[in-house]
Amino acid sequence: MTHKKRSVTPVQLIALGFFIMMLLGTGLLLLPVSQRNPGNLSVVDAAFTAVSAVSTTGLTVVDTASTFSTFGYVVLCILIQIGGLGITSIGAGLIAFTGRKLRMRDQVLVQEALNYPTMKDVQVLIRSVLITTITVESSAAFVGWFLFCRQFDVLPALGIAIFHSVSTFNHAGFDILGGLLSYRNDVGLQLLTIAENILGGFGFFVILDILRNRRFHKFSLHTKVVLTTSGFLDLTSSLLLKAIEGDSLSWVNAFFMGITSRTSGLTIANVGDFSDASQLLICVLMYIGASPG
């Protein structure tokens, strides 16, 4: 009796890759070097944090700023980046940058990972995605570095800026500042965070479409829908939050909350102090979320 050899599908390989990264992330976060007070982090809490980082969910059961060391921050930052780009995309991108051609199986994996509708120009796409990510995140980190240098020394400010940039662009919602409430009057940091949230919310396909075509009438239907819908939601939600909360929120605060509620989940104000109407609006925005792709 012969047994057919079952081949692993691209979707299964992608899921397996993420599962392995979650296990690896859990192990790394449990290392004493990853924690400020070694031994205080349970296996469950480490696993929860690793899964949240790789899936860019941003939910936490421990305070990120006070629980993890600098090495732990680096681990989380890498997990977030892998979660945002996808382990398949990163691997394929490294191959593409070496000048080698992707095998058909690799191209199928990338297509599935990025939800790309066609096999055409997959190698060009993945290179563009990586370049776009590096450009946006490094630019935001550079600006953030100057902003954080007002409060921290040069090297710590650089580390915080890089983490904040990666977490924000990938909509992970992690922060190592112990919350952003103390920055509610920092217009520069809020505008930088808003800009990264908007770009991350558009998705790679929209950003690349804008860079290539540059005129609205040349954009794909997907890009037009994303730009129109995002603009409407961001403007409407910001105006409603400002109207409901009044003087307790500045215009920049309202714009920040209106955008991040739908994307990264970062907050510049205590949502628990908001009125029921504002909390309901934020729930609706979280349900809608960012655009696909």
Positions of the model-derived regions?
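Membrane-proximal intracellular helices of multi-pass ion channels
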Residues: 1-293
